[in-house]
Amino acid sequence: MEVEVGQIVNTHGIKGEVKVKSNSDFTETRFQPGEQLLVKHNNTEIVYTVASYRIHKGFHMLRFEGINNINEIEHLKGDYIYQERDHQDIELGEHEYYYSDIIGCTVFKDDDTPIGRVINIFETGANDVWVVKGEKEYLIPYIEDVVKDIDIETKTIKITPMEGLLD
């Protein structure tokens, strides 16, 4: 199964480098030279092999093998990038999940009151933070004191909110 790992938001320079906004976990592994990525463009799937990878101003900068000119890649602006979900170099530990497993889950308080759906995840130094959209937008830290249960099969998450978390 494939998971979405990013979107090509622009080109960079004239030698065929693309600027990618990642919406995935494990980007340091997924975007390494030699990795294969699938780009879906106009109902066509194109497989590219990463030739180079670097981070520049918060974006992931990629060059693909065989692409040496902006004209060969410019038409992919706005397209999404995918990769096999179960990457051979990624091992999940206990209580670790793929972003794609968490995004879309419905979050409930421990009394079964629905709060909203996880729409985004961002990394902080200490822990991930889930953006949950309900009546308002809430920032839920992925920490043991708050997140009590995650059921990937039913796409549900139970939390015990800290005081002020949902205000």
Curated annotation (Swiss-Prot):
Q: Where is the PRC barrel domain?
A: 94-165
Report the subcellular localization: Cytoplasm
Which Gene Ontology cellular-component terms appear in the entry? Answer: cytoplasm; ribosome
Molecular function terms in GO for this entry?
ribosome binding
The record's keywords, sorted A to Z, are: Chaperone, Cytoplasm, Ribosome biogenesis, rRNA processing
Pfam families from the xrefs?
Answer: PRC_RimM, RimM
Q: Where are the annotated coiled coils located?
A: none
Q: Does the keyword DNA-binding apply?
A: no
Principal cellular location given in the protein's record:
cytoplasm
Which GO biological process categories is it annotated with?
ribosomal small subunit biogenesis; rRNA processing
* SUPFAM superfamilies tied to this protein: PRC-barrel domain, Translation proteins
Q: Which NCBIfam families match?
A: 16S_RimM
Q: What does this protein do?
A: An accessory protein needed during the final step in the assembly of 30S ribosomal subunit, possibly for assembly of the head region. Essential for efficient processing of 16S rRNA. May be needed both before and after RbfA during the maturation of 16S rRNA. It has affinity for free ribosomal 30S subunits but not for 70S ribosomes.
Family, per entry: Belongs to the RimM family.
Domain commentary = The PRC barrel domain binds ribosomal protein uS19.
Provide the assembly information.
Binds ribosomal protein uS19.
Q: What is this protein called?
A: Ribosome maturation factor RimM
Q: Which gene encodes it?
A: rimM
